[in-house]
From Swiss-Prot:
The keyword Disulfide bond does not apply. The keyword Protein biosynthesis applies. Residues 40-62 have a biased composition (Basic and acidic residues). Gene3D superfamilies: RNA Cap, Translation Initiation Factor Eif4e. Keywords: Initiation factor, Protein biosynthesis, RNA-binding, Translation regulation. Residues 1-72 are annotated as: Disordered. Residues 25-39 have a biased composition (Low complexity). It comes from Dictyostelium discoideum. The gene is eif4e. PANTHER family: EUKARYOTIC TRANSLATION INITIATION FACTOR 4E RELATED (PTHR11960), EUKARYOTIC TRANSLATION INITIATION FACTOR 4E1-RELATED (PTHR11960:SF8). eIF4F is a multi-subunit complex, the composition of which varies with external and internal environmental conditions. It is composed of at least eif4a, eif4e and eif4g. This is Eukaryotic translation initiation factor 4E. GO terms for cellular component: eukaryotic translation initiation factor 4F complex.
């Protein structure tokens, strides 16, 4: 390989050329060194900025976690439990509870939304399926102590495109205690059936006509319907599997 010294020997009469070559090499090395230094400085600055951003985000997250307001949940007046059942064929009144399963319970606004934001919509329920949302100490059974002297308002779902919103609105009215005579409310049920879906609100005291009618009228407002709805007592179902007569209408 030809070195700078070799160049000097070969071109002694015109030594200025060798000086120029050396200057070029020095300039090139200086430029390369300068660029490397600038790149390192830029890389260092970027790393510092990233670390500062990460530290800031970590501090903000820590402050949010330490903020007591972020840890406070808004309690509901009652604790509620969600149940599910599926009937593959004709419902046998004596054995239908065998498929009834308790899914989850909640007692705060935050937990309510956590449950319902992850719950399949009623419009997607398989035919034969039902959701039951009841106060935690009440099982969704006719013969339960809180239900056996009561009954239910039931509404046939005529517009399937509205069923998800109607179900959600009626559920929120239950857990939010916005029904008139809300103390009478035991729970609410959504049935997906071949012959038509149905929303039912269960109450405690069938013979309390005023309180029962208050619930029925409020349900119609919540669902935004003008159709006539019926109320049937559980007592008739308990006595006979043939069903019961409507006690009230509104």
């Amino acid at each position: 390989m030809t070195t700078n010294k070799d160049v000097e020997c070969l071109v002694e009469p015109t030594s200025n050329i060798s000086i120029t070559e050396e200057n070029k090499n020095v300039t090139s090395e200086t430029t390369t060194t300068t660029n490397n230094t600038q790149n390192k400085e830029t890389e260092t600055t970027d790393n510092i900025n990233k670390e500062e951003t990460a530290d800031k985000e970590n501090k903000e997250e820590q402050q949010q976690e330490e903020n007591p307001e972020n840890l406070i949940k808004h309690p509901l007046q009652n604790r509620w439990s969600l149940w599910y059942d599926y009937q593959s064929g004709k419902i046998n009144p004596e054995h239908w509870v065998d498929s009834l399963k308790k899914v989850i319970s909640f007692d705060s606004v935050e937990d309510f939304w956590c449950v319902f934001n992850n719950l399949p919509n009623v419009s997607n329920l398989k035919q034969g399926s039902s959701y039951h949302l009841f106060k935690d100490d009440i099982e969704p059974k006719w013969e339960h102590e809180s239900n056996k002297r009561g009954g239910k308002w039931f509404v046939m779902v005529k517009d399937k495109s509205r069923c998800d919103n109607q179900w959600l609105q009626s559920v929120m009215a239950c857990v939010g205690e916005t029904f008139d005579s809300s103390d009478e409310i035991c729970g609410i049920v959504y049935n997906s059936r071949k012959n038509g879906d149905k929303i039912s609100v269960w109450t405690k005291t069938a013979q309390d006509e005023k309180a029962t009618r208050d619930v029925g009228n409020c349900l119609k407002k919540i669902l935004e319907i003008d159709q006539t709805i019926q109320y049937t007592p559980h007592e008739d179902f308990i006595r006979s599997s043939k069903g019961s007569k409507n006690l009230y209408e509104c």
